Design a protein with these regions (language model features):
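Helix-start/capping segments and mature chain N-termini
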Residues: 1-43, 47-182
């Protein structure tokens, strides 16, 4: 299990925020990976409420992201990781022919539909100060100082605005964007 400490911290925080008490057991207590899922990457989903936990596992397949559509939503709230992703899914449907989306909230870059964003400028990684969800990998990289401690709320917005002004489009082509940022 990748980043167990960070998953545990997010679990405790979310549990407390939802139920006004801390959980009595560890998130990962009782997690057993079936033999058939012990090879390769596995996506582990742990759903819980105040009284019980449900653990599901499936093979993980990553998807290659080549294009991103910029979508604005000032009303979206995903501060806790929910099984119900209806609001994110509705935004994702607006991607046209793109592979994924970049979500702007109140004019600021937040996340993609699937995870946190990192922008590199002069070989320094920046992540939005106010993501929709503070992901576990993001927390780990910030703690390890692999991302800049100084957040730039505007960095992502500047990159997106610059791209849109030059290309007259809200479509970001990742390969071109990466070449131009170097």
């Amino acid at each position: 299990i990748q980043s167990p400490l960070w998953h545990e911290q997010r679990y405790k925080s979310a549990f407390h925020k939802s139920y006004n008490e801390f959980p009595k057991n560890s998130l990962l207590e009782g997690v057993l990976i079936p033999e058939k899922l012990k090879k390769g990457k596995v996506k582990l989903r742990i759903s819980y409420n105040q009284f019980e936990k449900k653990i599901e596992g499936s093979k993980y397949t990553s998807k290659e992201i080549k294009t991103l559509q910029i979508i604005e939503s000032n009303s979206i709230n995903y501060s806790l990781k929910y099984k119900d992703r209806k609001n994110l899914d509705q935004l994702f449907l607006k991607r046209n022919s793109c592979d994924d989306i970049i979500i702007l909230k109140n004019g600021l870059v937040t996340d993609s539909s699937y995870g946190n964003l990192v922008f590199f400028k002069n070989e320094i990684g920046y992540t939005p100060e106010e993501p929709l969800l503070k992901g576990t990998r993001r927390a780990k990289l910030l703690h390890e100082k692999k991302l800049a401690e100084q957040f730039s709320k505007q960095l992502g917005t500047e990159i997106c605005d610059e791209w849109q002004n030059r290309n007259h489009s809200k479509l970001l082509e990742i390969s071109k964007l990466i070449k131009e940022m170097k």
